[in-house]
Amino acid sequence: MDIRAAEISAILKDQIKNFGKEAEVSEVGQVLSVGDGIARVYGLDNIQAGEMVEFENGTRGMALNLETDNVGIVIFGADREIKEGQTVKRTRAIVDAPVGKGLLGRVVDALGNPIDGKGPIQGAERKRVDVKAPGIIPRKSVHEPMATGLKAIDALIPIGRGQRELIIGDRQTGKTAIALDTILNQKPLNVAGAPESQKLYCVYVAVGQKRSTVAQFVKVLEEQGALEYSIVVAATASDPAPMQYLAPFTGCTMGEYFRDNAMHAVIIYDDLSKQAVAYRQMSLLLRRPPGREAYPGDVFYLHSRLLERAAKLNDSQGNGSLTALPVIETQANDVSAYIPTNVISITDGQIFLETDLFFQGIRPAVNVGLSVSRVGSSAQTKAMKKVAGKIKGELAQYREMAAFAQFGSDLDASTQRLLNRGSRLTELLKQPQFSPLKMEEQVVVIWAGTNGYLDPLPLGKVRAFEDGLLSLLRGQHADILNTIRDTRDLSDETAGKLKSIVEGYAKTFA
């Protein structure tokens, strides 16, 4: 091997020329103890609350407890590689996440890193995950409908863009199914070329769920063509508690990007009970004093600061909105437990799902008596308002009468008629999964129910009547559906046309 002196001198000259005097100064601390996803670190005197830190092996963490002699850090990842005595480096950045349209169609973890194997996220900017909610002045009252495609909800418990509506019920009562149907129902709004004021982007945050469940959820979204306008944030049961705590905030930041840029989004937190459990675990390990049910004293603030970020902004702010659908799981229908009462008091209404109704075959298993939307009919179109007012009253009377009817069999004709109508309307509100209905189709079906066209039918034929009527209208009378959709009203003229069609159909159906 021959050594060329000229070559060596050229390399040396180049290195001397590019020699920089800058030295990187980073504040470091030392790990005192580590375990259960918590590290105690000495020496980070100037660290900020909520700041991201980096351990020697590249694992990240967040400073939560700032004490006199040490800092309590929650670790976003496995703590097996972290040892006592290792150095911890400040990043000088509060925890943030990527936001933007580049996230649509992707599955990410609680820090915004892609976990779907589709490569890095393109063109995303970064925003802090825990920011202040909009104040009173930038907001506007909720007035646009956020359709779920479910008759029982859109007619009786309407949700508006910018509202927070809680979905609450025991396990296996169809809470996630309602959320999934809501996402699928936005497909017609998100067609290519539609105006941004019409589109509704969806963010689904899975907290503490099985990986198989999340994979199945994503598969359904993909098959139904709904993933392209959705973002999935997953912190599964096998992820550390800090990730489960952070995921809802990360998802909310992604949703806020749409809200603040004159667009609309809906975010589903599935579910916040598991986030509260993860937060309780972290707090107890950080030796914060426990309160009721061993939750820390600020668990109410945990959920209120998250849900207050859902808002309908006014014209000067761009008219954007972020709608929140938090999910809470109860134990044996106990809605008076700590976390359920907290979230009920924060939200603008709740949808109660009951196990008994679910097993009776009433699905979605919504208890329309206990469920409420505090925004009410201001989040409905005129057409839906006209037909929904009647169905609410009739179902309320039916529930009252059904309780009395159990005691005696000799009922007068009017009571019998009321019970008959109520049972048909209850049957009408049933709906299979993955089959959301458009607003105009719901209006027509409910109009037929409240005007007595279902009364002569046996209960088992109600579904067939509804399906047949809708296929007739879609095929031969699409103009009626289009009129209701475009005017958002059910005029006397349209109602007259509808009456003759439904009467004709009822004769042939019988």
Curated annotation (Swiss-Prot):
Instruction: Note the InterPro entries from the entry.
Output: ATP_synth_asu-like_sf, ATP_synth_asu_C, ATP_synth_asu_C_sf, ATP_synth_F1_a_nt-bd_dom, ATP_synth_F1_asu, ATPase_a/bsu_AS, ATPase_F1/V1/A1_a/bsu_N, ATPase_F1/V1/A1_a/bsu_N_sf
Locations listed in the record = Cell inner membrane
Gene3D superfamilies linked: 2.40.30.20, ATP synthase alpha/beta chain, C-terminal domain (1.20.150.20), P-loop containing nucleotide triphosphate hydrolases (3.40.50.300)
Is Cell inner membrane set as a keyword in this record?
yes
Major location (coarse): membrane
Q: What reaction does this enzyme carry out catalytically?
A: ATP + H2O + 4 H(+)(in) = ADP + phosphate + 5 H(+)(out)
Q: How does it sit in the membrane?
A: Peripheral membrane protein
Instruction: Name the family.
Output: Belongs to the ATPase alpha/beta chains family.
Its keywords, alphabetically, are: ATP synthesis, ATP-binding, Cell inner membrane, Cell membrane, CF(1), Hydrogen ion transport, Ion transport, Membrane, Nucleotide-binding, Translocase, Transport
What subunit structure does UniProt give?
Answer: F-type ATPases have 2 components, CF(1) - the catalytic core - and CF(0) - the membrane proton channel. CF(1) has five subunits: alpha(3), beta(3), gamma(1), delta(1), epsilon(1). CF(0) has three main subunits: a(1), b(2) and c(9-12). The alpha and beta chains form an alternating ring which encloses part of the gamma chain. CF(1) is attached to CF(0) by a central stalk formed by the gamma and epsilon chains, while a peripheral stalk is formed by the delta and b chains.
- EC class: translocase
Q: Where ATP is bound, by residue?
A: 169-176
Q: Which cellular component, as a GO term, is one annotated location? A: plasma membrane
| Cited function | Produces ATP from ADP in the presence of a proton gradient across the membrane. The alpha chain is a regulatory subunit.
Database matches in NCBIfam families? atpA (TIGR00962), PRK13343.1 (NF009884)
Question: What SUPFAM superfamilies does the record point to?
Answer: C-terminal domain of alpha and beta subunits of F1 ATP synthase, N-terminal domain of alpha and beta subunits of F1 ATP synthase, P-loop containing nucleoside triphosphate hydrolases
Q: Does the keyword Membrane apply?
A: yes
GO MF terms here are: ADP binding; ATP binding; proton-transporting ATP synthase activity, rotational mechanism
Q: What is this protein called?
A: ATP synthase subunit alpha
UniProt site positions, description: Required for activity: 371
Could you say which EC number(s) this protein's record lists? 7.1.2.2
